[in-house]
């Protein structure tokens, strides 16, 4: 069968010299050249320089009579056959669809040998007992397998794309966190440098003052000592002179002179006053607050860099009807007026509590609860297991999946198996809750003074959720990271 290149070569041979396209209704003129009837008719209608001259052939320039061109039916058939060959080539019915051995079109598929056969091949002895099917029938089950494979592959590709998207988002979040921590470190150390410069100025000013006091007291000491030396030198000179005189002159007023010398007391001057010396000795103690500030700064910075701020919000689907939530779900206030809330399975119906919108399944997280208690009010903060009891009485203890502390009017209690009242330096108004899921620590600290409040130890295997309880009209709390 003709190849695609051969068909193209044949098609070039039956092109019209005028329009360069395939000949349509080919006609022959006197010189033997062929043209499309329409092309040659339009060519003859173009007037020449001499209206009396006959038109000439576009190829060889031989004159011909306008009415002398004849239809070339044989050439028209050739053109039609070539166009059919082109169509076959375009549809892909080329050499690959023809048996190389017999030149016949391939119709069958031998399932035993997995070979494509023509009619002659099928009748051959080697395939006589084999299972034969038409090509489309044989391809059908394979197409079905391909569709199944495509479905699986597309699903796996989608899963990989989802993983890629999720991990890209996670990496972007991590990059944002790193950038935030970088800015935090820069900001904290800028404040530290400012604080250190201020403290340096204060301490240097104190040292400068002490330096001035020492120099002033030195001048006073030198002046006092010089006066004493001068007076003692005068007495010594007077006695030496008296001693050199004759006896009669020596005895004149000798008693008053001796009394005056004997009663003369030497003042023992002190170069540096005890008070100034004590100030100098106490100076290192004045730097202790600076050392404490440095220690607290480093502890605070390391803690904040070590724990991931949890950007949490309150879940209105879990809040007790007596809790009023703000529009941004960052604040809750107690009210004796019940809200019109649907009684869904997630909502607390007796304990005036609310959970955060999202839970935690790993990592180290921290958040701050700012508490404003009315007289007689209380606020409970901590974490609970995701399957904590929502209906009926809620027992606040670790055995029930609750790890929390309660801040009441005037005292703080750790809600362990048995509530324990804690002794603190001051009543916290801001409590930092820090969760280390893998280690199993729930730590509470005063967010302002960083005084430790209490730490629970547990073994977490399920999701835990930040937990908040509130009681007392006018009492409220708000969240921050």
UniProtKB/Swiss-Prot annotation:
User: Any idea where this protein resides?
Assistant: Cytoplasm
Any GO BP annotation? erythrocyte differentiation
The protein's UniProt keywords, in alphabetical order, are: Coiled coil, Cytoplasm, Metal-binding, Zinc, Zinc-finger
Transmembrane helix: present as a keyword of the record? no
Zn finger limits (B box-type) = 94-135
Q: Which GO terms describe its cellular component?
A: cytoplasm
Q: Which Gene3D superfamilies match?
A: 2.60.120.920, Classic Zinc Finger (3.30.160.60), Zinc/RING finger domain, C3HC4 (zinc finger) (3.30.40.10)
- Name a GO molecular-function annotation: ubiquitin protein ligase activity
Residue ranges annotated as zinc fingers (RING-type) are 16-61
- Where in this chain does the record put each B30.2/SPRY domain? 292-481
According to its UniProt entry, the function of this protein is described as: E3 ligase that plays an essential role in the differentiation and survival of terminal erythroid cells. May directly bind to PTEN and promote its ubiquitination, resulting in its proteasomal degradation and activation of hypertrophic signaling. In addition, plays a role in immune response regulation by repressing the phosphorylation of STAT1 and STAT2 in the interferon/JAK/STAT signaling pathway independent of its E3 ligase activity. Mechanistically, interacts with the intracellular domain of IFNAR1 and thereby inhibits the association between TYK2 and IFNAR1.
| Record's protein name | Tripartite motif-containing protein 10
Which species is this UniProt entry from? Homo sapiens
Q: What is the lineage of its organism?
A: Eukaryota, Metazoa, Chordata, Craniata, Vertebrata
Q: Which gene encodes it?
A: TRIM10
């Amino acid at each position: 069968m003709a190849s695609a290149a051969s068909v193209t070569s044949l098609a070039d041979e039956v092109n019209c010299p005028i329009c360069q396209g395939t000949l349509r209704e080919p006609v022959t003129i006197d010189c033997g050249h062929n043209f499309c009837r329409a092309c040659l008719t339009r060519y003859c209608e173009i007037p020449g320089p001499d209206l009396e001259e006959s038109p000439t052939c576009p190829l060889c320039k031989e004159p011909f009579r306008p009415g002398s061109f004849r239809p070339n039916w044989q050439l028209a058939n050739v053109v039609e056959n070539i166009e059919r060959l082109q169509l076959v080539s375009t549809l892909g019915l080329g050499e690959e669809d023809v048996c190389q051995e017999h030149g016949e079109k391939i119709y069958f598929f031998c399932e035993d040998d997995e070979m494509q056969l023509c009619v002659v091949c099928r009748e051959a002895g080697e395939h006589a007992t084999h299972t034969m099917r038409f090509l489309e029938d044989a391809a059908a089950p394979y197409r079905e397998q391909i569709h199944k494979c495509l479905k699986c592959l597309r699903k796996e590709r989608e899963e990989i794309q989802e993983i890629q998207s999720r991990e890209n988002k996670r990496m972007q979040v991590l990059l944002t966190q790193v950038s935030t921590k970088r800015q935090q470190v820069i900001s904290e150390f800028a404040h530290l440098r400012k604080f250190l410069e201020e403290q340096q100025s204060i301490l240097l000013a104190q040292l400068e003052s002490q330096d001035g006091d020492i120099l002033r007291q030195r001048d006073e000491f030198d002046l006092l000592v010089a006066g004493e030396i001068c007076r003692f030198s005068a007495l010594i000179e007077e006695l030496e002179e008296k001693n050199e005189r004759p006896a009669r002159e020596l005895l004149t007023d000798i008693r008053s002179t001796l009394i005056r010398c004997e009663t003369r007391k030497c003042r023992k001057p002190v170069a540096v006053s005890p008070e100034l010396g004590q100030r100098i000795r106490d100076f290192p103690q004045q730097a202790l607050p600076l050392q404490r500030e440095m220690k607290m700064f480093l502890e605070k910075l390391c803690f904040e860099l070590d724990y991931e701020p949890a950007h949490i919000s309150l879940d209105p689907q879990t809040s007790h009807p007596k809790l009023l939530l703000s529009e941004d779900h960052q604040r809750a206030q107690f009210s004796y007026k019940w809200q019109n809330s649907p009684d869904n399975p997630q909502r607390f119906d007796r304990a005036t509590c609310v959970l955060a919108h999202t839970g935690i399944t790993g990592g180290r997280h921290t958040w701050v609860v700012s508490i404003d208690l009315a007289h007689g009010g209380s606020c409970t903060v901590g974490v609970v297991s995701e399957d904590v009891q929502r209906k009926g009485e809620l027992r606040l203890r670790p055995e029930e999946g609750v790890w929390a502390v309660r801040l009441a009017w005037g005292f703080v209690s750790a809600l362990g198996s048995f509530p324990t009242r804690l002794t603190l330096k001051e009543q916290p108004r801001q409590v930092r809750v820090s969760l280390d899921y893998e280690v199993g620590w729930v730590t509470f600290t005063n967010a302002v003074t960083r005084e430790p409040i209490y730490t629970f130890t547990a073994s977490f295997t399920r999701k835990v959720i930040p937990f908040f309880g509130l009681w007392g009209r006018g009492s409220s709390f708000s969240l921050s990271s």
